[in-house]
Amino acid sequence: MPLKLSKELGFVIPLVRVRDEIALGPFTYRILIDGVVLGEDEVFPDDCLALEAGPIDTPVPGRVVKDPSFGLPACWIAPEERDLATASGYTVVDAATVIGTHLNHILGQQSHLLLGQDEVQALLDTLAAAHPQLVAGLVPKLLPLATVTTVLQRLLEEGVPIRDLRRTISSLAAVAARTQDPAELVRIGLGGAIVQTRCSLREPLMAISFASDLEDLLTQAVRASGSGAYPFDPALGGRVGEAVRAAAAPLIAAGTRFAVVTTPLLRRPLWGLLNA
């Protein structure tokens, strides 16, 4: 799984280390990155997990839980109930698959935590072998390695792969000299790639946008806060979050891909608000 994820994201995911932890319960596992617990749950090696991924004809008895990766309703069942559960509409997996899927999900969501300056330097060295002037013209001429690392981490944090590194570095070089926030403007040159993370080439991408008066109000809040991490009044932020969730609910229910569209100034603060 880490190898497949490495290809999808564009950098090598470090090896996963597995060790016993006597302080945990007999069926409990934890997933940590840099000593921080990012996931924890229980698995029962002798049983199977039946996931309610769609309509269920006949519920099967078992230990009721939530799927650790996506929060789907599920239950642990005896292996002899597997065929019955599958026939009833459940998706049935073994304990190893549960842990592997949970690990892959966390690595995908938190991949930015795994990319540091050493990893970025290795990526740039590889790119420089084919495009030496591109790399030399950016680092350290226009931006230090630390800033390039921050930009790539930001992209990964927001679900944008960096596997097309030449395009990413080219876009970064194009905006580096005219902005104090290259992590935001680099997205302009990556627009097509970003859209394709949400939908296929021929699939329409639905958009949620803000009324102009609300956008003006939010813009004023961001400008007044300077570089504040939380620029919005809690009451206003709460109302905006509720409104976006209400607009998104029918799209999510229909399985329709969508994007929230706003100005470059508001995009990152709103991303933080909606993902809090």
What are these regions (language model features)?
Residues M1-A276:
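Membrane-embedded alpha-helical signal segments
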